[in-house]
């Protein structure tokens, strides 16, 4: 490896003349060196080993060295170049060269020997001399067409083969030019790295700036084209490259992985000529040189299966045909995609073998459609940027050292491809795209140099000119071929006049009259006539976006229009290249077209521009002035507004006012005034309203303006139901008898559900009960079954047969997508060619389906459409027949559908057939709806062509049901009585009728000019024969029968009996059902896991089916409480789910409804509706939680058991909601909401004030970035990182979500950081007292999620008394590290945690020594105070909650300032720095142990560093005599030390003391041998039990068995082990407390334990038993003792021992009380310890911490004697038990000092008993158990 590197260096210096360019490109390619070398080695098949090794040696710098040099030494070894260097290097080079030549296999270099056939990419510079054949693969495009301006000039293979290493550069360029495709035949030097580079170029990152950083290039490259080049190394047989092995430096490794191309997609397959693969098969290569597989004869030539591959990072134009063999040789990535493609192909082949020829034909047509799309992707739609190779050194595909002037200046263009989003843009060579798409390049340059760009100086913006009418169409509109119709020119004049008068207006022409063209003409008029160049903003629905784009190109090509849609990356690309001129900072575009959704997502960007014109298509989306879309758009700065809608009035005058208020807020300011003026207008036909509207609204209808439009004739075809439909219809009514019988007392939604079911039944039986698979056999039977299941389909079948014969083309509309599925199946079986458009068909496919149907000579016979899909602007005028299969609630919706065919351009009469099922709800709905439509037409002639509902004057009601309960009841009864007269099973089939007879009976009349709006509306329905006035009177006078008269009793009874049976079954099945649902709920985490979604889905569907018959079913026990559907009217379940998801992202969500609406895509909903839903969720959750808590109080066992921690769930409509997660999120984000200022100016200055731990990201990250991140979360919602990234005000664009996914911070790191910052905020607000009262309670509830173990050590260590505080948290993930870093969730933090834990253990070993003297002195005082402790307890609780305190012997507790935390002022820091200089080396090494150390060695390393540092600090402190000074400087110095590691000062100090103690113990053990242990020196982390004794004497003096011996620990037991007492009596020493020892254990265990049996540090295998230790002892006095145990750094609010139980997840808690309660009840079965045999612990294996031999502890065997202080603790714990048995000796007496354990406990020689107790106090104990 080194040799190769040296060789490269030598060459590098020998090529000094090219140094500058070479270095630049080397940066870009340095990490690719391995791959480069490999490609260059293969560059010259004929040059022999010399050239081979030469290229190899140059490999690492192939990009950087001038190929002219290599040409000179074409066949020479590297030797000559090396001569200039010292001999040793020369020898090494020669040595390497020789080895490469002699043992190519060893180094994987063998390829170099063979002429490696590089895919012959289209060689642009072909005609260049050998020098021009430089090996630099230019960008794929460049490579291909570099110099050769014509595609035709691809060099012959011979020529290519002549390219020796000297000529390899150009060749590489070729290679690079197009997506590298392996071409066996043409040996080409593969410069792998170059493809990458090329990729980088293509990246949209490469801006057209002249000087992109070279070092950025490699990143871009890797990202952009993962390893393209693989495809070029054709003949690689070896898995490893020698180059990679040899040259592997750190970077090389990454690059090596990038050597190969990646398959992105397999597009097609074929049988092709063997070897006709690779670069020669790209589109442009075939155009230039012909298809290598063109003369393939399957009979004579050898063939192979080939696949059309779209390569990752290359555009579609570079797709190549490859065989499996060629792909494997190139070692491409993504072969799994090929396997999947082959599998799918096999399935299709099998299917094609079984189906009829017509099906095969249909399949082939579909394939053709798909391949047409792929061809479209090879067409450049627009060029958006240019760069020359010179400007992007290091990013181009040809080497920077190339001397060729042409390539260095040859431009590359960033191309947007037709039909693909901007994110798919790619850089292409001019030579490649210039040939075919020169017009795109020209238009790009003309746009770039255009002077017609928006400017604020335009006079017309400030002062409108006088209006001059256009008498004829101006020349700038549409050129010579396009002509505006008269009424369109009139419309243009009206728009221009309004603009001159400063009136914003509504263009409300009927659909089909060309509103789009009139608007574009108006913008062109402003552009040309008044030099107003924009910016114009046009907001349109997605469905009409392409037609707007197309019309702009046709009618106003001079206007630079940008279509602003796509994903985040696409929009970023648009803003980077299409937005502003980098020099002038002026906007580039004149008009911007976008959609409502994108407008809301990027409202900050779009809202910052001053728009000269704002146009909104389909403007009835703005009818709700309370919706987010409305509120957002009305705030946009615009000089003129135009609303384009065919339906200005939908449900009420309020909606008309909303539109008027939007365009002219000053004139139509208040709805109340408008209503007062015009609300009563129906008496005079709204004449006053007409007058007011006149200047602001223009509406023409087709029959007024388009005399040439052929007639439209509508016929209603009434059909009978089939026998099966009749059965189903009766069955639906009978099953719902109870709901129906309630009449007006029933629920509207219940009735609507029944109506919908009946409407489905009228359409087709399969909508009610789909057929079983096995019921459907051959095609003919399927067809018959399909047709017989619907009376409408029987008629349609006959109708279509007739229409097909006549050559008509048909549009078939249905509201129900499932009905469209059935019709599609019918048409497929009948082999009628058709297209389909519904909501699921998007974008390009939709557009292509429309184009295909409208194309000249199209064979499509039918077009299936969803009545509401596709927006209004869809033109299907090539059809002349419309079939309305099922009518909408509102027939006007169907008028919109008809207008798709009956519009301008239609030459034939349009026949409309409306199918209605006779005697059913369908017929009645049409009749009633028709009558309700009349009022609408009195205001604006036939304005409602899409109205979902019927006009009601003042109600803003916009739900989709226009009927009230009474009407719904009447509709349901219509026809039912006659139906039930037919006996069950005897339903008659509809009579066979001739289609001509049917059409004759449905009397046909043409549209006539109506005398009134009402007549005109009604004339839409040619139904005079079917619904005469008498019928209507009859309808009104029809006697109202009750349902029990309509539905025969026997059928009702039959259904009731079935229901009863079903209920009985349910009762039997209940336990099973309950357990399964319970399981689903309990095991869910709070996050939206898949299982939860499934549960929600099932519950949603359950509720949908059960809502209507809830009365009939027994309520299931345990079912979540649910909120009725009608309480969330206007929201679907999917919308509610989205709302809840967004609700959890914001603080105080009820005040952030607009943000929630935007996030949940509910912008059409009014704020009132959103608020109603938000309040419903909040209130339901709060009450559910209260109920749950009450239940827990009543029945404590309810909340126990696994899975119960999840808390209650509720159901809102069909959506199941976890109450706890909602409330938790509300609390978490409330703090953020409170801390962010409301004032926008203040908000910009917002900065975190608390100290924040550093974030270890790959970018600079400071407190400002944290503050901006919080601001982003506040503005855009938690988790919406992409929006935060793109918000320019936050300035985080370059910092978060880097494109390289291995860089941080990605989403996961941001989430972790955000969680940490939110916790800091909460702490900060607590401190400030901002949180009071109820909020404090909330915080307590949340606390279980925040561990603050660090507070424990602090009190102990600094104040000498072990003051307990209950644990703050049971959440393992937030232990310890949360306080420091908040990054507890990331894997790195886990490692840090381990390290920290390890060190804590060491620390704790010695942490008692300093305080021992204090403790001993205070014991006697504590004894006196002890009896008061009971009284003190309650008061201390309240005090404790305020924070840690100093406790001194003679005074009240003094609070410790929490902010004395870990920061030093500059002066103190400098002093500390100087004092610690002698141990600088230890400080640096503290957190960086050498790599390769094992666990034990790492531990020793850390311990030694700490000891050096701690000893130095102790030395520094000797200078002080005053205790206060000593404390202060000890603290300062340790804080200084903490800057070198992740741990805080307290932890480090504690770790040092533990290590110090251990050291002194080990020294003592060397001197003394314990006679009990037989001279062995057991490792004892604790010197004695004195720490426990001191604890006992402090906290339980009144119970002490030997009160007269306060210092007893000094002389008992431990002496037996030879630990001198002075260790414990020394004033500066103190012993372990339980908590400390627990920390020590945990730290040791978690640092070195995970799976590692490292003897000295114990094992983590035993924790499963520790849980049982609790069970073996009474803890009656537990609460009393708690106050004196567990470390002092924990929060002191005792009251929160089990705070808010139900709020914690089940793994967060092992409730202490559970154990206490259980074991009190258990006492009968358990013997107290006094009555157990001495070796009980040894026998009871549940209590044993380990059963391994004790060889782990410095090789010592088991100890027969355990330390006597265990018995102290035993005595202490036992004292709540009954009085000691007289026979039992005092635990402190000498006989008792023998350990009850005969075998040594691996847990630091402590009994499981004391460990269990201490661990119960230790916040980390549960953590251990859980983790284990």
Swiss-Prot record:
Residues 175-204 have a biased composition (Basic residues). GO terms for cellular component: chromatin; nucleus. The keyword Magnesium does not apply. Residues 795-946 form the Helicase C-terminal domain. The modification Phosphoserine is found at residues 207-208, 242, 1085, 1087, 1365, 1386, 1807. Residues 15-75 have a biased composition (Low complexity). One of its GO terms (biological process) is gene expression. The modification Phosphothreonine is found at residue 240. Belongs to the SNF2/RAD54 helicase family. It catalyses: ATP + H2O = ADP + phosphate + H(+). Pfam families: CDH1_2_SANT_HL1, CHD1-like_C, Chromo, Helicase_C, HTH_CHD1_Hrp3, SNF2-rel_dom. Interacts with MYOD1. Interacts with histone H3.3. The CHD1 helical C-terminal domain (CHCT) may bind DNA and nucleosomes. This is Chromodomain-helicase-DNA-binding protein 2. Residues 261-353, 378-456 form the Chromo domain. It comes from the Eukaryota. Residues 1584-1601 have a biased composition (Polar residues). Residues 1-14, 81-101, 115-128, 146-155, 1037-1065, 1347-1371, 1396-1431, 1565-1574, 1698-1720, 1739-1749, 1760-1772, 1795-1814 have a biased composition (Basic and acidic residues).
């Amino acid at each position: 490896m080194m040799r190769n590197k040296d060789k490269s260096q030598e060459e590098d210096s020998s090529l000094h003349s090219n140094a500058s360019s070479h270095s630049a490109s080397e940066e870009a390619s340095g990490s690719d060196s391995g791959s480069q070398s490999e490609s260059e080695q293969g560059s010259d098949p004929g040059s022999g080993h010399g050239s081979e090794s030469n290229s190899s040696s140059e490999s690492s710098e192939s990009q950087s060295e001038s190929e002219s040099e290599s040409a000179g030494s074409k066949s020479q070894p590297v030797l000559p170049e090396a001569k200039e260097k010292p001999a040793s290097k020369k020898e090494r080079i020669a040595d390497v060269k020789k080895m490469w030549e002699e043992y190519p296999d060893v180094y994987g270099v063998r390829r170099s020997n063979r002429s490696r056939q590089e895919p012959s990419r289209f060689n642009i510079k072909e005609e260049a001399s050998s020098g021009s054949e430089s090996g630099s693969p230019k960008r794929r495009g460049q490579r291909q067409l570099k110099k050769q301006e014509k595609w035709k000039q691809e060099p012959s293979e011979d020529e290519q083969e002549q390219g020796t290493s000297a000529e390899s550069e150009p060749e590489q360029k070729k290679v690079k030019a197009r997506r590298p495709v392996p071409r066996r035949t043409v040996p080409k030097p593969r410069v792998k790295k170059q493809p990458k580079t090329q990729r980088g170029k293509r990246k949209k990152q490469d801006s057209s700036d002249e000087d992109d950083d070279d070092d950025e290039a490699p990143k871009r490259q890797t990202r952009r084209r993962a390893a393209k080049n693989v495809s070029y190394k054709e003949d690689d047989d070896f898995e490893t490259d020698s180059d990679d092995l040899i040259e592997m430096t750190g970077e090389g490794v990454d690059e090596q992985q990038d050597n190969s191309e990646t398959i992105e997609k397999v597009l097609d397959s074929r049988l092709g000529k063997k070897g006709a693969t690779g670069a020669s098969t790209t589109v442009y290569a075939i155009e230039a040189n012909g298809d290598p597989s063109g003369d393939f004869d399957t009979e004579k030539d050898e063939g192979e299966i080939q696949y059309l591959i779209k390569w990752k990072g290359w555009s579609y134009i570079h797709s190549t045909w490859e065989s499996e063999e060629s792909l494997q040789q190139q070692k491409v990535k993504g072969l799994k995609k090929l396997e999947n493609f082959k599998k799918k192909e096999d399935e299709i082949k099998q299917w094609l073998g079984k189906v009829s020829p017509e099906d095969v034909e249909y399949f082939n047509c579909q394939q053709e459609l798909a391949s047409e799309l792929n061809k479209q992707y090879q067409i450049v739609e627009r060029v958006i940027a240019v760069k020359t190779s010179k400007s992007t050194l290091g990013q181009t595909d040809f080497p920077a050292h190339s001397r060729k002037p042409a390539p260095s200046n040859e431009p590359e263009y960033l191309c947007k491809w037709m039909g693909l989003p901007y994110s798919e843009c790619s850089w292409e060579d001019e030579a490649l795209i210039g040939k075919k798409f020169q017009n795109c390049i020209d238009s790009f340059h003309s746009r770039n140099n255009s002077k017609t760009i928006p400017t604020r100086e335009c006079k017309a913006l400030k002062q409108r000119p006088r209006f001059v009418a256009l008498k004829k169409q101006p020349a700038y509109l549409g050129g010579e071929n396009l002509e505006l119709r008269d009424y369109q020119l009139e419309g243009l004049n009206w728009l221009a006049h309004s603009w001159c008068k400063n009136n914003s207006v509504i263009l409300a022409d009927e659909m089909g009259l060309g509103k789009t063209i009139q608007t574009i003409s108006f913008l062109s008029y402003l552009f040309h006539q008044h030099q107003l160049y924009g910016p114009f903003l046009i907001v349109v629905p997605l469905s009409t976006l392409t037609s707007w784009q197309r019309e702009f190109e046709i009618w106003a090509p001079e206007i630079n229009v940008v279509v602003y849609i796509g994903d985040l990356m696409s929009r970023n690309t648009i803003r980077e290249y299409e937005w502003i001129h980098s020099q002038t900072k002026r906007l580039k575009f004149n008009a911007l077209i976008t959609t409502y959704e994108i407008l809301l997502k990027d409202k900050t960007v779009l809202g910052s521009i001053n728009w000269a014109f704002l146009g909104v298509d389909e403007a009835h989306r703005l009818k709700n002035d309370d919706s987010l879309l409305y509120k957002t758009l009305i705030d946009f700065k615009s000089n003129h507004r135009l609303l384009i809608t065919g339906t200005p009035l939908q449900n009420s005058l309020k909606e008309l006012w909303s539109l008027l208020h939007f365009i002219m807020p000053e004139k139509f300011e208040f709805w109340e005034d408008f209503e007062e003026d015009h609300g009563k207008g129906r008496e005079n036909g709204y004449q006053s309203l007409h007058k007011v509207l006149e200047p602001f609204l223009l509406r023409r209808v087709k029959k007024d303006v388009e005399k040439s439009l052929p007639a439209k004739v509508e016929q209603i075809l009434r059909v009978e139901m089939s026998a099966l439909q009749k059965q189903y219809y009766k069955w639906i009514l009978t099953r719902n008898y109870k709901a129906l019988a309630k009449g007006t007392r029933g629920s509207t939604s219940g009735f609507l559900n029944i109506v919908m079911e009946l409407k489905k039944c009228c359409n087709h039986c399969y909508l009610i009960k789909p057929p079983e698979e096995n019921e459907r056999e051959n095609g003919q039977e399927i067809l018959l079954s399909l047709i017989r299941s619907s009376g409408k389909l029987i008629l349609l079948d006959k109708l279509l047969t007739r229409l097909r014969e006549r050559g008509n083309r048909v549009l078939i509309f249905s509201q129900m997508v499932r009905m469209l599925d059935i019709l599609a199946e019918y048409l497929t079986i009948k082999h009628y060619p058709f297209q389909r458009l519904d909501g699921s068909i998007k974008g390009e496919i939709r557009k292509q389906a429309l184009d295909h149907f409208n194309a000249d000579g199209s064979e499509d016979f039918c077009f299936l459409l969803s009545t509401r899909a596709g927006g209004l602007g869809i033109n299907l005028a090539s059809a002349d027949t419309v079939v309305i299969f099922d009518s909408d609630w509102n027939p006007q919706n169907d008028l919109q559908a008809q207008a798709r065919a009956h519009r301008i351009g239609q030459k034939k009469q349009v026949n409309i057939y409306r199918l209605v099922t006779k005697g059913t709800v369908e017929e009645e709905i049409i009749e009633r709806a028709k009558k309700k439509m009349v009022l609408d037409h009195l205001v604006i002639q036939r304005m409602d062509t899409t109205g979902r509902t019927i006009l009601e004057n003042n109600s803003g009601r916009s739900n989709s049901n226009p009927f009230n309960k009474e009407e719904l009841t009447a509709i349901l009864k219509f026809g039912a009585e006659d139906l039930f007269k037919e006996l069950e099973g005897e339903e008659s089939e509809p009579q066979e009728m001739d289609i001509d007879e049917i059409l004759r009976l449905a009397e046909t009349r043409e549209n006539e000019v109506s005398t009134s709006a009402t007549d005109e509306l009604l004339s839409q329905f040619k139904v005079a024969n079917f619904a005469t006035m008498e019928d209507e009177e009859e309808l009104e006078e029809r006697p109202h029968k009750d349902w029990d008269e309509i539905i025969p009793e026997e059928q009702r009874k039959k259904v009731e009996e079935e229901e009863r049976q079903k209920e009985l079954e349910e009762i039997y099945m209940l336990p099973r059902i309950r357990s399964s649902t319970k399981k689903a709920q309990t095991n869910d985490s709070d996050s939206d896991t898949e299982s939860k979604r499934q549960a929600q889905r099932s519950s949603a569907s359950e509720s949908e089916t059960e809502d209507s018959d809830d009365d009939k079913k027994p309520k299931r026990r345990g079912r979540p409480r649910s909120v009725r559907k009608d309480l969330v009217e206007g929201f679907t379940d999917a919308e509610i789910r989205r709302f809840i998801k967004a609700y959890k992202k914001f603080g105080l969500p009820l005040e952030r409804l607009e943000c929630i609406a935007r996030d949940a895509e509910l912008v059409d909903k009014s704020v009132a509706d959103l608020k109603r839903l938000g309040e419903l969720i909040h209130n339901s959750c709060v009450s559910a939680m209260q109920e749950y808590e009450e239940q827990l109080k009543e029945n404590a066992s309810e909340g126990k058991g696994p899975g119960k921690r999840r808390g209650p769930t509720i159901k809102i409509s069909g959506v199941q909601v976890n109450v706890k997660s909602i409330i938790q999120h509300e609390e978490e984000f409330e703090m953020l909401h409170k801390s962010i200022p409301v004032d926008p100016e203040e908000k910009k200055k917002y900065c975190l004030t608390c100290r924040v731990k550093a974030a270890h990201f790959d970018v600079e990250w400071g407190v400002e970035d944290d503050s901006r991140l919080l601001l982003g979360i506040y503005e855009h919602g938690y988790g919406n990182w992409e929006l935060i990234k793109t918000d320019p005000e936050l300035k985080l664009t370059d910092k978060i979500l880097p494109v390289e996914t291995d860089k941080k911070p990605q989403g996961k790191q941001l989430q972790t950081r955000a969680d940490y910052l939110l916790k800091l905020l909460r702490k900060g607000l607590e401190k400030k007292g901002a949180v009071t009262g109820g909020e404090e309670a909330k915080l307590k509830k949340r606390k279980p999620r925040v561990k603050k173990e660090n507070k424990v050590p602090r009190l102990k260590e600094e104040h000498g008394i072990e003051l307990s505080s209950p644990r703050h948290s049971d959440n393992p993930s937030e232990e310890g590290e949360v306080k420091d870093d908040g990054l507890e969730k990331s894997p790195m933090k886990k490692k840090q945690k381990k390290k920290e834990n390890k060190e804590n253990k060491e620390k704790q070993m010695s942490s008692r020594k300093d305080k021992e003297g204090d403790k001993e002195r205070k014991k006697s005082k504590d004894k006196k105070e002890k009896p008061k402790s009971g009284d003190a307890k309650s008061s201390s609780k309240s005090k404790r909650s305020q924070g840690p305190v100093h406790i001194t012997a003679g005074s009240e507790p003094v609070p410790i300032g929490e902010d004395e935390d870990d920061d030093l002022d500059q002066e103190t820091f400098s002093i500390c720095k100087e004092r610690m200089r002698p141990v600088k080396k230890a400080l640096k090494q503290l957190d960086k142990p050498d790599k390769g150390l094992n666990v034990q060695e790492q531990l020793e390393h850390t311990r030694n560093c700490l000891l050096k540092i701690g000893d130095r600090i102790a030395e520094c402190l000797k200078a002080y005599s005053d205790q206060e000074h000593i404390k202060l400087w000890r603290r300062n110095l340790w804080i200084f030390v903490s800057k070198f590691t992740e741990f805080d000062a307290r932890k480090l100090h504690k770790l040092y003391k533990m290590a110090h103690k251990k050291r002194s113990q080990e020294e003592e053990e060397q001197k003394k041998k314990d006679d009990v242990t037989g001279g062995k020196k057991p490792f004892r982390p604790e010197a004695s039990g004195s720490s426990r004794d001191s604890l006992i004497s402090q906290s339980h003096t009144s119970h002490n068995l030997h009160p007269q011996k306060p210092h007893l620990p000094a002389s008992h037991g431990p002496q037996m082990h030879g630990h001198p007492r002075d260790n414990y009596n020394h004033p500066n020493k103190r012993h372990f407390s339980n908590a400390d020892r627990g920390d020590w254990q945990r730290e040791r265990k978690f640092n070195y334990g995970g799976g590692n049996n490292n003897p000295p540090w114990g094992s983590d295998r035993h924790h499963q038993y520790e849980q049982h230790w609790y069970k073996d002892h009474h803890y009656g006095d537990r609460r009393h003792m708690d106050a004196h145990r567990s470390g002092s750094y924990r929060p002191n609010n005792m009251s929160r021992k089990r705070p808010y139980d139900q709020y914690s997840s089940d793994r967060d808690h092992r409730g202490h009380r559970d154990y206490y309660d259980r074991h009190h009840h258990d006492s009968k079965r358990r013997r107290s310890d006094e009555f157990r045999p001495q070796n009980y612990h040894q026998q009871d294996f549940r209590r044993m911490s380990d059963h391994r031999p004790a060889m782990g502890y410095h090789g010592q065997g088991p100890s027969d004697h355990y330390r006597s202080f265990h018995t102290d603790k035993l005595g202490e714990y036992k004292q709540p038990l009954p009085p000691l048995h007289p026979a039992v000796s005092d635990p402190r007496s000498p006989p008792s000092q023998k350990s009850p354990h005969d075998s040594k406990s691996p847990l630091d020689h402590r009994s499981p008993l004391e460990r269990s107790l201490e661990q119960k106090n230790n916040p980390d104990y549960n953590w251990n158990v859980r983790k284990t």
